[in-house]
Swiss-Prot record:
Keywords: Cytoplasm, DNA replication, DNA-directed DNA polymerase, Nucleotidyltransferase, Transferase. Its main location: cytoplasm. Its EC number is 2.7.7.7. One of its GO terms (molecular function) is DNA-directed DNA polymerase activity. CDD domains: DnaE_OBF, PHP_PolIIIA_DnaE1. The keyword Cytoplasm applies. One of its GO terms (biological process) is DNA replication. It comes from Escherichia coli O6:H1 (strain CFT073 / ATCC 700928 / UPEC). It holds the Pfam family DNA_pol3_alpha. This is DNA polymerase III subunit alpha. The gene is dnaE. The lineage of its organism: Bacteria, Pseudomonadati, Pseudomonadota, Gammaproteobacteria, Enterobacterales.
């Protein structure tokens, strides 16, 4: 093979994030196709792609050169930043490069991102080779300015600290000043004996990618392409040129090419991958292995005492636990993982000791008895047939992986503890990368190309919002996309460009739960990335790469449900303490509680973890779970595979005796499988059952059975043929018929694809059960905790308030004197609305109010509150929201009076604050001489109409709390429905139609599997609710009426709803209140007394009626005197449309009782 003549030493991948288009694998593939022997990827201040690049390079026979580009600051150039490329020549250089990158984030973050100080290179110079940065380097900038003194100073620095390791970089990509710089640099090199090196400053693979790269940079920088202010720093020539192209380009400077090869030869870094490095756990004089055995055996004693309080039963059951524990300990110690278990044990125990709620376990880790004994998990794996080998398989060496759930609000405390224990330099969270996803990339590209918002929005909305959606999938899922793509050239151009950018790395973030603990400093294994303040370090390798690099990952996951349980328990135990009862231990509740399962069977699972979706409620209704094993099955069954395969129907039919239970099939079953499959009525539902079947029928070890399960999941034909043979041989040795064994193997293989990890299902079913139990036994505290968790989502809170009302719980309006930021339960068992759930009121103002209340007692009225609270934190807008929500109802006679007095209260408070500041406020404060004035102010103001009060609640709370808009219509609605309220509805006889009315509280349109549209709305008249279905014909006719907060009158047939257990109506006719009035009302009656009538009133009456003329309803004026009453009928030209607006105007003018509709 001929000697290479050129190697690319400066290349950006998409991990640079500010620029760079290609991913590492395609860059390596292109280099290989060009016959390059080596390649450097030098992303901007990071090594994020190093592990992938290193693997891809070696796989393609290309030597990976490790490097990075930097922005550099030095005192010589003031605030001006220059460029520098740093390559690692050896492993010491790699370590120094890692430290340099980490330091840039930790100490050098500026407006332009991470920066290094040039002086840092002095300490970290060993093993590094520098490329000068071309015209953008410090030498380059100085040359272009003709500042020879500055050039000399810069060169002297590099000659002193990087002899033979500093190269003047030459670039020819057609950008301004490149040639001027190049000639000056070559002259300098000759004069000072400095080596030169050629690069192409690569940003993309092919020159045709230039436009896509320009858009990528414009997206990052926030410009449109045609913006004259947009920086134009790149050229179409910055692609991966071939060796021939580079040789032709630098034919006049051959040494610049030769030096690329020499540098490549000098760069020899070995990155240790595929090993594991655990931190040392303190065990005193004992070995880690012995200490684990000691702690596990002590823990098992405690667990057995809890599980089997009866000593005789404990002695009887003990052998199987001891045997299982010994087996697991042997495997853990042989595989070298005792330290891992001890580390997890310690931070979980610390959490429990310090009031941080911890989940019962999740994932396959719940299958370990050692984990249960160490209190890492809280489910007895023997009771639920959970297998250790599903977690840690001695026949397939891989790191154990405990996913641990913590309370969301306290999770960071645990991470802080771990950092304190092992050293902050040894603990870090893990990076995660945001990429340009299908929907967002359409919007971003459209914006940069300058398309109108509506045009881009139309295309973007055609892309389904499903997780993992791609443009390719969207084209298959949405027929309109390919249609507009072919029909519209602008759409085609936008989508084609979006396809080039889809999946490109856009930004970096923090992994939801991953934490790594190193035996030494994190930077011995990976560089760090930090936020702009140099805090919250994360490894620059993502979760898979960081493990491959040797660091052990621990998942500290935040589970909101644990926070809810914790809040509920705090309220419950506060009440129990007042009653002299011991605190409730949620881990000790019985798993067979009848009240909980009765609630579950009624599908009353709103707010219950994992069980609250409509589909899950439907499954619960059909399954009627009556034991904890059924709850474990619920979690496993409610997935697309089981639901679509018919497995769920079989499971339900077998449970309820509609289908014969067989193990696993009527034709092909074996009695030995009964203990394995009995909990699931003979259905192969769990991965553990697949493993147990292989063990029972064919003598597999559980480790070998886990390998079989994995093989079945991957569906590799050659591996399956091998496993089929092993299964057949084992079955034959056990004396099982060969045909039967193979038929069962086929069934197992079929269901293995749907099988779920029972350990995970059981652990999460336990959390589900705990929330179900709390809802059944402590409904107010539980629902208050759930609403607190959802305070930022008004729509969710509204739904949860509805559920509270359905449960018969009383909810009090927010109250500035008794309320808290969050929802809580008072001594009477009523839920007090959380002040923090009021829209438009932040945490700061509420804290200021509660602080003033704690300091000076309850507020007497509005002036008192304003005087005692810091009005800098509590502005007028916030106070208005609090008044409208009802939070100030105790501070005045009514909300209108409070709103009317607000200006005076704020003014008085301001005067009080000023007087206090100069020491002249009297001890009685602002109120000393004002009570009478306040009373007068209140008395002069009329209360708001009920609808205004309710509208204020709706605006600030998202719902009506103290009343209901339907109240003003009830008398009228009785006329339309014959006096029947929704709570009194009954199923209609066949062919009979009944009428119902109510406020629409929910409305949606769904599409069935057959493509038919169905409208569903829920009516509420405060007595009850009714779900109304509108099938195709009715929906086409009335869909425009299906809006929330509209009063509807609906006629149709009423029947039982098998899903909800309530009633539903199939609609035939739908009217809103205006149409009903036009249809049923016979007149609009206005009653006036002789004392009311004058020219002014009649004139205003005329003005109110005028806009509503041309309707069909006649107006009748009733004139009342002490001795007589007369009816005057207005002429036909004064017939009106009796809208809400007209009725409200007239009632406001004359009086609520003097305006009403007349019916036959």
């Amino acid at each position: 093979m001929s000697e290479p003549r050129f190697v690319h030493l400066r290349v950006h991948s998409d991990y640079s994030m500010i620029d760079g288009l290609a991913k590492t694998a395609p860059l390596v593939k292109k280099a290989a196709a060009l016959g390059m022997p080596a390649l450097a990827i030098t992303d901007f201040t990071n090594l994020c792609g190093l592990v992938k690049f290193y693997g891809a390079g070696h796989g393609a026979g290309i030597k990976p050169i490790v490097g990075a580009d930097f922005n550099v600051q030095c005192d010589l150039l003031g605030d001006e930043l220059t460029h520098l490329t740093v390559l690692a020549a050896n492993n010491i250089g790699y370590q120094n490069l890692t430290l340099l990158i980490s330091k840039a984030y930790q100490r050098g973050y500026g407006a332009a991102g991470p920066i290094i100080d040039r002086d840092w290179l002095i300490e970290l110079n060993e093993g590094l080779i520098l490329l000068s940065g071309g015209r953008m380097g410090d030498v380059g900038r100085s040359l272009l300015r003709g500042n020879s003194a500055l050039v000399d100073e810069c060169v002297a620095f590099y000659e002193e600290h990087f002899p033979d390791r500093y190269f003047l970089e030459l670039i020819r990509t057609g950008r301004p000043d490149e040639e001027s710089y190049l000639h000056a640099a070559v002259e300098l090199a000759e004069a000072r004996g400095l080596p030169v090196v050629a690069t192409n400053d690569v940003r993309f693979i092919d020159s045709s990618d230039f436009d896509a790269h320009e858009i990528r940079v414009a997206i990052h920088d926030g410009f449109t392409l045609d913006d004259p202010k947009r920086p134009r720093n790149y050229s179409p020539q910055q692609y991966m040129r071939s060796e021939e192209e580079m040789c032709e380009l630098f034919a006049d400077i051959p040494e610049a090419l030769a030096n690329t090869v020499e540098i490549a030869k000098r760069c020899n870094v070995t990155v240790r991958l595929g090993e594991y490095f655990l931190p040392q756990f303190p065990t005193g004089d004992m070995s880690t292995e012995d200490y684990l055995v000691k702690r596990a055996k002590e823990g098992l004693e405690e667990r057995l005492a809890f599980l089997f309080p009866d000593e005789e039963e404990r002695l009887k059951r003990r052998p199987e636990y001891d045997e299982r524990l010994d087996t697991e300990l042997q495997v853990i110690n042989q595989m070298g993982f005792p330290g891992y278990f001890l580390i997890v044990m310690e931070f979980i125990q610390w959490s429990k000791d310090n009031g941080v709620p911890v989940g019962p376990g999740r994932g396959s880790g719940a299958g370990s008895l050692v984990a249960y004994a160490l209190k890492i998990t809280d489910l007895d794996p023997l009771e639920f047939d959970l297998l250790f080998e599903r977690f840690l398989n001695p026949e397939r060496v891989s790191m154990p992986d405990f996913d641990v759930d913590f309370c969301m609000e306290k999770r960071d405390q645990v991470i802080e503890h771990v950092a304190d224990m092992y050293g902050r330099d040894a603990v870090s969270q893990i990076i995660t990368f945001g990429t340009m996803a299908a929907k967002a990339v359409i919007r971003d590209v459209g914006r940069v190309l300058g398309h109108p918002y509506g045009f881009v929005d139309r295309i973007s909305k055609l892309i389904p919002p499903d997780p993992g959606m791609t443009l390719a999938k969207a084209f298959e899922a949405e027929p309109q996309l390919p249609e507009i793509y072919e029909a519209d050239e602008e759409v085609k151009a936008l989508i084609d460009m979006a396809r080039k950018l889809e999946g490109v790395t856009r930004n970096a973030g923090k992994h939801a739960g991953g934490v790594v603990i190193a035996p030494t400093k994190i930077t011995d294994f990976a560089p760090l990335y930090c936020d702009e303040e140099g805090k919250h370090p994360v490894t620059q390798f993502d979760k898979s790469d960081v493990e491959y690099a040797g660091l052990v990952k621990f998942d500290f996951l935040g589970l909101r449900t644990l926070t809810i349980i914790n809040w509920a328990l705090e309220m419950i135990n506060k009440r129990r303490a007042k009653n002299g009862e011991p605190p409730l231990d949620i881990a000790a509740i019985p798993l067979d509680d009848k009240k909980s399962f009765d609630m579950l069977q009624r599908s009353e699972t709103t707010a219950v973890f994992q069980l609250e979706s409509r589909g899950m409620k439907d499954l619960i209704k059909r399954l009627q779970p009556d034991c904890f094993e059924d709850m474990i099955a619920l979690v496993a069954l409610f997935r697309p595979g089981p639901l679509q395969s018919g497995m769920v129907d079989n499971f339900i039919d077998r449970k309820h005796g509609r289908e014969e239970i067989s193990y696993p099939d009527v034709q092909w079953q074996h009695e030995s499988l009964k203990p394995v499959l009995e909990p699931t009525y003979g259905i192969i539902l769990y991965q553990e059952q697949v493993m147990q079947i292989a063990q029972v029928l064919s003598g597999y070890t559980l480790g070998g059975a886990d390998m079989l399960r994995r093989a079945m999941g991957k569906k590799k034909p050659e591996e399956m043929a091998k496993q089929r043979s092993v299964f057949a041989e084992g079955a034959e040795k056990n004396g099982i018929n060969a045909e039967l064994a193979m038929k069962i193997f086929d069934l197992v293989e079929k269901f293995a694809g749907y099988g779920f990890n029972k350990s995970h299902s059981a652990a999460y079913a336990l959390v589900s059960y705990q929330t179900l139990w709390l809802k059944a036994h402590y409904p107010a505290e539980f629902m208050a905790a759930v609403m607190t968790a959802d305070m930022d989502n008004t729509e969710k809170v509204v739904g949860l308030v509805d559920e509270c009302w359905r449960m018969g719980l009383k909810i009090l309006p927010p109250d500035i004197n008794s309320g808290l930021y969050h929802f809580h339960v008072n001594d009477d068992g009523e839920i007090v609305y959380g002040i923090g759930a009021i829209k438009g009121v932040g945490e700061g103002p509420i804290e200021a109010i509660i602080e003033a209340r704690n300091k000076g007692g309850y507020f007497r009225e509005l002036f008192d509150l304003c005087a005692r609270t810091d009005t800098k934190k509590l502005n007028r807008r916030v106070l208005e929201k609090l008044i409208m929500s009802g939070a100030f109802d105790r501070l005045g006679p009514h909300r209108a009076a409070l709103m009317n007095s607000l200006g005076d209260a704020l003014k008085a408070a301001d005067q009080h604050a000023k007087a206090e500041a100069i020491g002249q406020a009297d001890m009685f404060g602002v109120l000393a001489e004002e009570p009478e004035q306040i009373e007068q102010s209140y008395a002069s103001c009329q209360p708001w109409p009920e609808q205004v009060v309710l509208d204020g609640e709706r605006e600030t709370l998202g719902l009506y709390l103290t009343g209901h808009p339907i109240n003003q219509y009830l008398k009228e609605i009785e006329r339309y429905v014959g006096g029947v309220r929704l709570k009194d509805m009954h199923p209609t006889e066949r062919g009979k139609v009944t009428t119902a009315a109510g406020l629409v509280v929910a409305a949606r349109v769904m599409v069935t599997k057959r493509g038919n549209r169905i409208g569903i709305c829920t009516l509420d008249d405060r007595s009850g609710r009714l779900e109304v279905m509108l099938f195709t014909d009715a929906l086409d006719k009335y869909q425009q009426l299906l809006e929330k907060d509209r009063i509807l009158i609906v006629s149709g047939q009423v029947s039982f709803d098998d899903f909800s257990g309530g009633l539903k109506m199939t609609a035939r006719e739908v009217m809103d209140i205006d149409e009903a009035r036009e249809k049923y009302a016979r007149g609009l009656a206005i009653s006036l007394t002789d004392r009311q009538i004058d020219d002014q009133l009649l004139n205003r009456l005329r003005q109110s009626l005028e806009p509503h003329r041309s309707g069909t309803i006649p107006v009748h004026l009733y004139y009342q005197r002490a001795d007589a009453r007369a009816r005057l009928r207005f002429g036909a030209t004064w017939r009106v449309s009796p809208s809400d607006r007209l009725l409200n105007d007239l009632r406001g003018l004359i009086g609520s009782e003097q305006v009403e509709l007349e019916f036959d």
